[in-house]
């Protein structure tokens, strides 16, 4: 994560302070140079004539106060120059700090631009993925609808098959019941036939003997649709 750079307002204030300090330093240097030139010109001025060479009625001018004033001004100019030098050094330090801050701002701006480009690329990729996911969701929705329709149809077919199986089971049970009833009837007829045969054997052989008709006897295995095999009579 990039560290936040200095505030732009503070950078501009420091830059304005630096410019003002440079201007004041130049003005003070100019004032000091003027004072220095004035003092030098005063020192180079010709000496006053000797008192004996001057007219007794003319009083020599007293230049001591002017020299003291010039010295005072020179000292003030030197002090101002020192102050301006200090301010100039401080302004140079502020300038270096501003340059470092501006460089940090440029680096931060470059990093932010790089991150912005990366974010734009990610946004474009996210849009593409969103479109693809929308298409996939549409396909999945259609597949789900088809699956639900197939499941409903399969459920209906299963219910119909269960109904048919129940009907077939009921029909099978009814068929088994009919088969059992027919077998019992067959067994009864066979028992009756056996009894008739025994009675015919015990009768005398004279006279004609009529055979009992067994045309009403059902054939074994005549019932169709029942799966149980016929039971052999004991």
From Swiss-Prot:
Residues 1-43 form the signal peptide. Residues 67-171 form a coiled coil. Keywords: Coiled coil, Signal. Residues 44-63, 194-234 are annotated as: Disordered. It comes from the Eukaryota. Residues 203-219 have a biased composition (Basic residues). This is Coiled-coil domain-containing protein 194. It comes from Mus musculus. The gene is Ccdc194.
């Amino acid at each position: 994560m990039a560290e936040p750079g200095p505030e732009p307002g503070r950078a501009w204030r420091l830059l304005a302070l630096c410019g003002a300090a440079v201007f004041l330093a130049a003005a003070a240097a100019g004032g000091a140079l003027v004072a220095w030139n004035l003092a030098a010109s005063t020192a180079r001025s010709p000496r006053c004539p000797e008192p004996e060479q001057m007219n007794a009625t003319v009083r020599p001018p007293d230049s001591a106060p002017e020299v003291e004033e010039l010295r005072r001004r020179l000292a003030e100019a030197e002090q101002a120059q020192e102050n301006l030098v200090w301010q100039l050094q401080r302004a140079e330090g502020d300038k270096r700090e501003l340059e470092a801050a501006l460089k940090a701002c440029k680096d931060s701006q470059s990093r932010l631009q790089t991150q912005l480009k990366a974010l734009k690329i990610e946004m474009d990729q996210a849009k593409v993925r969103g479109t693809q996911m929308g298409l996939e969701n549409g396909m999945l929705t259609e597949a789900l609808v088809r699956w639900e329709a197939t499941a409903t149809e399969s459920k209906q077919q299963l219910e119909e098959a269960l109904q048919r199986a129940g009907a077939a089971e009921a029909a099978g049970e009814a068929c088994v019941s009919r088969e059992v009833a027919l077998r019992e009837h067959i067994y009864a007829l066979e028992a009756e036939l056996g009894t008739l045969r025994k009675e015919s054997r015990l009768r005398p052989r004279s006279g004609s003997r009529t055979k009992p008709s067994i045309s009403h006897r059902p054939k074994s295995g005549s019932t169709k649709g029942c799966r149980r095999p016929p039971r052999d009579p004991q």
